[in-house]
Regions:
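ABC ATPase NBD coupling module
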Residues: 25-42
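Conserved ABC ATPase "signature" region
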Residues: 72-87
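Conserved ABC ATPase signature
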Residues: 91-95, 99
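Hydrophobic anchor residue at the start of the ABC signature
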Residues: 105
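Catalytic Walker B motif of ABC-type/P-loop ATPase nucleotide-binding domains
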Residues: 116-120
Length: 167
């Protein structure tokens, strides 16, 4: 979680230098971070950060309205693929944690990105949904020519990693 928070710019209580496009991220202004997070960096947070008082689809619309990245048909296909079609209009707070995790995952795909950060992405998913998530994120990253960074101390998402680092 700390690694993703550092790279995503939510925390800066670290020593050393993190560069993005040859620029030290500690030098970025708020405006630059907004643009980076809108166009280059996507994140699935471990704590999900969904709005429990909104429905599943409203949580996705919030993000997608900002980016305009996915069509309604594409969003509905993601809900279908992850077994959430019948949960579109259910308040997120009424969903199980695994269902909330899938909603948060869909939200992370609703934007362009150069890198997607997945912080404990399948911790509350069964094997079938974990596999579907693996296929979806791999397909989206390939389509966008993007990198995937995963942090995990528990259940591991099965991707064809270029490199695995143990910290």
């Amino acid at each position: 979680s700390s690694l993703c928070s550092y790279i995503y710019g939510y925390r800066n209580d670290y020593q050393g230098i993190i560069n993005f496009d040859e620029t030290n991220i500690k030098a970025y202004s708020v405006k630059q971070w907004v643009e980076l997070r809108k166009h280059s960096l996507s994140m699935l947070f471990q704590d999900l950060r969904i709005f429990t008082e909104l429905t599943a689809i409203e949580n996705i619309r919030l993000k997608n309205n900002l980016t305009g990245y996915k069509t309604r048909k594409e969003v509905l296909a993601l809900f279908e693929a992850l077994g959430l079609s019948d949960k579109l209009n259910v308040k997120a707070g009424k969903l199980s944690f695994g269902q909330q995790q899938r909603v948060a995952f869909i939200r992370s795909l609703c934007q362009p990105f150069d890198f997607i950060f997945l912080d404990e992405p399948i911790s509350h998913l069964d094997d079938d949904n974990a596999h579907i998530m693996e296929e979806l994120v791999t397909g989206e990253a390939k389509k966008q020519g993007a990198g995937i960074i995963v942090t995990s101390i528990g259940k591991h998402i099965e991707l064809k990693y270029d490199r695995i680092l143990k910290l």
